[in-house]
Amino acid sequence: MPTVRRSRTLRATPEEIWAIVGDPHHLPRWWPRVARVEGVEEDAFTQVLTTAKGVPVGADFHVRESEAPHVRRWAQQLVNTPFERVLAESQVEVRLEPAGETGTRVAMALVQRVRGLAVLGSFMVRSAGRRQLDDALDGLEALVGR
């Protein structure tokens, strides 16, 4: 199962970063291609993503784990969606660990298990996943500083 991991140490406390990571409403500010977030509930939300051609696409997620200010994990709901043809599983995990007195190590993992013939392109999925996590860390860093 392709898993991509990225991490970075930011100059902000875990609580400061959690205020952003723990609230899906903030995703458009730091997560790549998210135009807006709708239907936010305690354990679910919908990301409205913008494709490269500018077309909005909705993606539903369930929060699988949330322990402030340490870990947040969410998984995409794939059944009966256009994503189901390509992905068997897609989930994101963000872990926050104190680093010194005022820093936080932000570790992200993206698990994407591809389906069927899409397995042949799994190296491309990993490459895109690395870009996505790097862009997410860049966005988070821009919000909290380094």
Which role does the model predict for each range below?
Residues 1-8, 15, 91, 99, ...:
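Hydrophobic-ligand-binding modules of eukaryotic lipid transfer/binding families
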Residues 28-32, 36-39, 54-105, 111-113, ...:
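Hydrophobic-ligand binding "helix-grip"
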Residues 105, 111-146:
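A conserved amphipathic terminal alpha-helix motif
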Residues 1-42:
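Hydrophobic ligand-binding cavity/cleft-lining segments
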Residues 45-47:
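N-terminal glycine/threonine-rich, aromatic-flanked beta-hairpin/loop signature
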